Amino acid sequence: MNLPPRQQSIIEEVRERGYLSIEEMAQMFAVTPQTIRRDINQLAEQGLLRRYHGGAAYDSSIENTAYTMRADQMRDEKQRIAEAVASLVPDNASLFINIGTTTEAIARALLNHRNLKIITNNLHVAATLSAKEDFEVLVAGGTVRSDGGIVGQAAVDFIQQFRVDFALVGISGIDEDGSLLDFDYQEVRVSQAIIDNARQVFLAADSSKFGRNAVVRLGPISLVNRVISDSPPPAAIARLMAQHKVHLDLV
């Protein structure tokens, strides 16, 4: 496919970095934001990248974006979501918190709480929350990934020993049929155990997750009680949420 040089360069930069904002691309190519928006719209229509509010990302169904890039993506939206999730958690509660940069933001937002018991397979979450003397933090055993996530059968077995008040979970994608999707089969198995052993499940998902592809199916959206997001989901997902009485919190 023959593309104009700037559009070809946009694709190469987005693939390398995972995500770029419109402002970054406008500065990079010395053009106006309106010009970049037109380029992004044309490339998205051809399926060459994914358009998001304020930027664009390279979308793969088999490989997630690098951890450091994910941590920078949708940072403001994740912070608002994290604060909203934390506001739903009372003091003296027991929690599961799974792998993800959004759940790490939630951990930081929980630091003003008191007397929480947290079970996690996320080393970054554990490091953040263990700083509070009145928090009890339990960490699953298993294989430690480079992003601080812990996976494997040992992690599943550990999680299954508990029954907690709340599961605070993130996800890589939500398909239009309501499927919750992720990239790592082993991570999904731990997340399934987390959901199965919580009384209430809160899914923190910024708007980039709606319609995003990933290769491993965790289960249907009916598994969760609440979805906390920065934007309403597409109509098909919204209908499924209403059908299964999944509450939507917008921030």
UniProtKB/Swiss-Prot annotation:
Residues 20-39 bind DNA. GO terms for biological process: glycerol metabolic process; negative regulation of carbohydrate metabolic process; regulation of DNA-templated transcription. It comes from the Bacteria. One of its GO terms (molecular function) is cis-regulatory region sequence-specific DNA binding. Residues 3-58 form the HTH deoR-type domain. SUPFAM superfamilies: NagB/RpiA/CoA transferase-like, Winged helix' DNA-binding domain. The keyword Transcription applies. Keywords: DNA-binding, Glycerol metabolism, Repressor, Transcription, Transcription regulation. SMART domains: DeoRC (SM01134), HTH_DEOR (SM00420). It holds the Pfam family DeoRC. NCBIfam families: PRK10906.1. PANTHER family: GLYCEROL-3-PHOSPHATE REGULON REPRESSOR, HTH-TYPE TRANSCRIPTIONAL REGULATOR SRLR-RELATED. Repressor of the glycerol-3-phosphate regulon. This is Glycerol-3-phosphate regulon repressor. It comes from Pseudomonas aeruginosa (strain ATCC 15692 / DSM 22644 / CIP 104116 / JCM 14847 / LMG 12228 / 1C / PRS 101 / PAO1). The gene is glpR.
